[in-house]
């Protein structure tokens, strides 16, 4: 999208209030959605909750193909469709809602750096586990990803996706990594996040930002998703302040879930 077009979209978005019927689309929750997409969806849900903006979550088998970027989640607000956390944050900001306006320029740069860390390490590790770890691929990924579709389409779509992810892994230098090396990267990422969080309730003290939403989305999903082993979730559990952070956001922003899954 050109800068002129982006500015025009921002102007339109800013003139319209947030509607009550805003919708977030993701894949089927129980039987289809994978770890990385679930984490991305939860991050956006957390961000909108933190902004006090209502959104209805709708699960569709073809959500990935409905998305303008081919990635989930995406939101449908008025006549606008926006996908992924970064563009959604900018879209919401154009409507006058921002979680990071109170930060100075140095803090904003730091926030963006940590968000890059999460995307480069945690998200990539999730994709690696889903599509490059043979045990996970064989026992979980193929069956879940293709679950809405008949044979042989279910396998064709899954293997196409696996090929895409493996090509990406090779391009970024993760193609020859072992699972142990990936888990070590996750541990280093969690260590950096734990040190930055310290004893604060949120990464920038008392108020959450989009960084908090992103970290929560990934860590909470890692902690609550059943995989072929507990190795990934155990890396997160080594950091008590990250666990407390996830519980805090779950209890404060997702109280309608009832008894917390991290209790």
UniProtKB/Swiss-Prot annotation:
Q: Which residues carry this modification: N-acetylserine?
A: 2
Cellular localisation? Mitochondrion outer membrane; Mitochondrion
Q: Which UniProt keywords apply?
A: Acetylation, Membrane, Mitochondrion, Mitochondrion outer membrane, Protein transport, Transport
Q: What is its main location?
A: mitochondrion
Cellular component GO terms, alphabetically? Answer: mitochondrion; nucleolus; SAM complex
Transferase as a keyword?
Answer: no
Q: Which GO terms describe its biological process?
A: mitochondrial transport; protein transport
InterPro entries, from UniProt? Glutathione-S-Trfase_C_sf, Glutathione_S-Trfase, Metaxin_GST, Mito_Protein_Transport_Metaxin, Sam37/metaxin_N
How does the annotation summarize its subunit structure? Interacts with MTX1/metaxin-1. Associates with the mitochondrial contact site and cristae organizing system (MICOS) complex, composed of at least MICOS10/MIC10, CHCHD3/MIC19, CHCHD6/MIC25, APOOL/MIC27, IMMT/MIC60, APOO/MIC23/MIC26 and QIL1/MIC13. This complex was also known under the names MINOS or MitOS complex. The MICOS complex associates with mitochondrial outer membrane proteins SAMM50, MTX1 and MTX2 (together described as components of the mitochondrial outer membrane sorting assembly machinery (SAM) complex) and DNAJC11, mitochondrial inner membrane protein TMEM11 and with HSPA9.
What this chain does, per the record? Involved in transport of proteins into the mitochondrion.
Family of this protein: Belongs to the metaxin family.
Full protein name: Metaxin-2
Organism field = Mus musculus
């Amino acid at each position: 999208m050109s800068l002129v077009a982006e500015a025009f979209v921002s102007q339109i978005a800013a003139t319209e209030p947030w509607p009550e019927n805003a919708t977030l689309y993701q894949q089927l929750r129980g039987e289809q959605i994978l770890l990385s997409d679930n984490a991305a969806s939860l991050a956006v849900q957390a961000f909108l909750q933190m902004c006090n903006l209502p959104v209805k979550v709708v699960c569709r088998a073809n959500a990935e193909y409905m998305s303008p970027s081919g990635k989930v989640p995406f939101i449908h607000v008025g006549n606008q469709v926006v996908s992924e956390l970064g563009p959604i944050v900018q879209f919401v900001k154009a409507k006058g809602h921002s979680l990071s306006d109170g930060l100075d320029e140095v803090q904003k740069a730091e926030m963006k750096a940590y968000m890059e860390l999460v995307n480069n390490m945690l998200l990539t590790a999730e994709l690696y586990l889903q599509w490059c770890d043979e045990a996970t691929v064989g026992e979980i990924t193929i069956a879940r990803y293709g679950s809405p579709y008949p044979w042989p389409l279910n396998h064709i779509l899954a293997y196409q996706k696996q090929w895409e992810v493996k090509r990406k892994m090779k391009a970024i230098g993760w193609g020859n990594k072992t699972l142990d090396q990936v888990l070590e990267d996750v541990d280093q990422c969690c260590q950096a996040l734990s040190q930055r969080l310290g004893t604060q309730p949120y990464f920038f003290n008392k108020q959450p930002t989009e960084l908090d939403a992103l970290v929560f989305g990934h860590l909470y999903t890692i902690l609550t998703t059943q995989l072929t082993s507990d190795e990934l979730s155990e890396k997160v559990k080594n950091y008590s302040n990250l666990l407390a952070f996830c519980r805090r956001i779950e209890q404060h922003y997702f109280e309608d879930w009832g008894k917390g899954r991290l209790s």
